[in-house]
């Protein structure tokens, strides 16, 4: 199995899996993200205790890429401090813009590395970054 097949499989698994797609009870933060160009629409909900992201989940609809990206991001940020989560977001967005190519710097992204070449499909970039921008907005506005 080649790397592209593994990446495609990971995206499909996360987009179909419901383990991060559910409403949270009494979230501390709730932020809606919308991509008007393709209709992706998510609401990201986060519980924070002592500056640590204790729990996160999302609800909404969208393409496989937006749904998988949201799920993978949530797996990454759970248990991290808010600052660590924002560092991960910044690294992810820099990777998407091809500003980072150093493999060691990208290790922090774990499974989200599957989106590294999404910029080769410009119409899909907004799908991949929706949850990440939504997280940034959620934290800024809280």
Features from the language model and the residues they span:
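Domain-level signature for proteins that mediate thiol-based redox and metal-cofactor handling
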Residues: 1-142
């Amino acid at each position: 199995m080649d790397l592209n097949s593994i990446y495609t499989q990971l995206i499909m698994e996360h987009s179909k899996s419901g383990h991060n797609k559910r409403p949270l009870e009494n979230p501390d933060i709730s932020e809606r993200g919308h991509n008007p160009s393709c209709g992706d629409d998510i609401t990201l909900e986060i519980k924070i205790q002592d500056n640590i992201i204790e729990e996160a989940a999302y609800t909404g609809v969208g393409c496989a890429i937006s749904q998988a990206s949201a799920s993978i991001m949530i797996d990454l940020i759970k248990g991290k401090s808010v600052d660590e989560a924002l560092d991960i977001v910044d690294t992810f967005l820099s990777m998407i813009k091809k500003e980072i190519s150093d493999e060691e710097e990208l290790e922090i992204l774990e499974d989200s590395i599957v989106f590294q070449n999404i910029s080769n499909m410009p119409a899909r970039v907004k799908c991949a970054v929706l949850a990440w921008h939504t997280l940034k907005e959620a934290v800024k506005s809280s």
